[in-house]
């Protein structure tokens, strides 16, 4: 076998050293006045605009994703207290990637490289295989599909247990609806939810309460005002099509199908890059800390799958 020439080696190395986007592969979608960009990093949604107006508070192609913008959160959304949980007799410990609160947060796949497996002008599908890891010794095949249509942007997600034993599962997403030039304070918010989860200083739910008569009651649309939202809502009122719809003024509506019983609302006050310039409306299949509390937790048997969908359309 002959030796490789220097030129051959340079050809091999050049792709490795070529600059890449911090968010990886970019799939650009368009339909009429709508445009969206989905990315290989975490299978996330980097931007969504209509007629040149940003519906989402996204980030640039040369920027690193910050504050969870547009990320997918699996195999759990939000937090796990102490990163510790028990499942089928196994005591498991996850890395504490929110060290200031001693929590595990937002799953294991949002910083992983997903593969774009299908791509058309108005649609892209990405997949990722989550191998067993310390703290989550289970195998999941994940797929997300983003599509543009007359009813806006639709996101379909599917998870399949490809391991040999049952596994705990939940999924969420972290899009921020943009407030435009101003703050969210003046925008009317409509959240058709009867119940809010009450969290402690570590953002772990410790109780649940009716929103009736509280500042958290947005069942009738009203301006957000100065309230700092970092609350999980549930007991959602659904329309005849089974969808629950969260509406933000003249910005957008985010809907969830029946596989998402929870929606997290976050005005981003502790995060300078998003604080009150946008509001995260986070679809979630389970409550925060579900791996410990069991609230909304999905059990996937070997070969079992879970599917869900949510979407956004402009006002």
How would you name each of these model-derived features?
Residues 35-91, 96-97:
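Acidic-aromatic substrate-binding/catalytic surfaces of carbohydrate-active enzymes
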Residues 4, 93-94, 176-259:
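Active-site/ligand-binding surface loops and adjacent short beta/alpha elements
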Residues 247-283, 288:
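Glycine-rich active-site loops that engage anionic ligands at enzyme catalytic sites
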Residues 2-32:
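Short, Gly/Pro- and small/polar-rich lid/capping loops
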Residues 85-93, 157, 299-315:
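Short Pro-Gly-centered flexible turn/kink motifs
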Residues 143-145, 295-300:
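Beta-strand-rich interaction surfaces with strong enrichment in secreted/lumenal proteins
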Residues 96-150:
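Extended, loop-rich substrate-binding clefts of extracytoplasmic carbohydrate-active enzymes
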Residues 36, 128-180:
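Acidic, contiguous internal or C-terminal segments within carbohydrate-active enzymes
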């Amino acid at each position: 076998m002959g030796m490789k020439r220097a030129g051959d080696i340079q050809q091999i190395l050049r792709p490795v050293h070529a600059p890449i986007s911090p968010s990886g592969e970019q799939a650009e979608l368009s339909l009429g006045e709508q445009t969206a960009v989905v990315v290989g990093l975490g299978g996330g949604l980097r931007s969504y605009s209509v007629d040149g107006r940003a519906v989402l508070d996204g980030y640039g192609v040369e920027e690193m994703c910050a504050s969870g913008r547009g990320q997918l959160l699996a195999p759990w959304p939000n937090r796990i207290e102490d990163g510790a949980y028990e499942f089928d007799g196994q005591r498991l410990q996850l890395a504490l990637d929110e060290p200031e609160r001693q929590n595990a947060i937002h799953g294991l796949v949002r910083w992983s490289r997903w593969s774009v497996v299908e791509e058309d002008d108005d649609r892209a599908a990405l997949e990722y295989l989550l191998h067993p890891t310390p703290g989550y010794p289970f195998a999941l095949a994940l797929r997300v599909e983003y599509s543009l249509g007359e009813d806006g942007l639709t996101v379909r997600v599917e998870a399949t247990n490809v391991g040999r034993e049952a596994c705990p599962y939940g999924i969420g997403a972290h899009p921020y609806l943009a407030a435009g030039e101003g703050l969210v304070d003046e925008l009317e918010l409509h959240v058709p939810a009867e119940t809010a989860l009450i969290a402690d200083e570590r953002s772990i739910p410790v109780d649940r309460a009716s929103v009736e008569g509280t500042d958290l009651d947005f069942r009738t649309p009203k301006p957000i005002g100065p309230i700092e939202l970092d609350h999980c809502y549930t007991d959602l009122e659904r329309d005849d099509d089974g969808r629950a719809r969260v509406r933000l003024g003249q910005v957008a509506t985010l809907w969830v199908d029946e596989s998402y019983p929870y929606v997290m609302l976050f005005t981003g006050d502790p995060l300078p890059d998003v604080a009150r310039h946008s509001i995260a409306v986070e679809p979630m299949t389970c409550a925060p800390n579900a791996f410990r509390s069991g609230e909304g937790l999905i059990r996937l048997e070997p070969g079992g799958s879970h599917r869900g969908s949510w979407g956004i359309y402009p006002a």
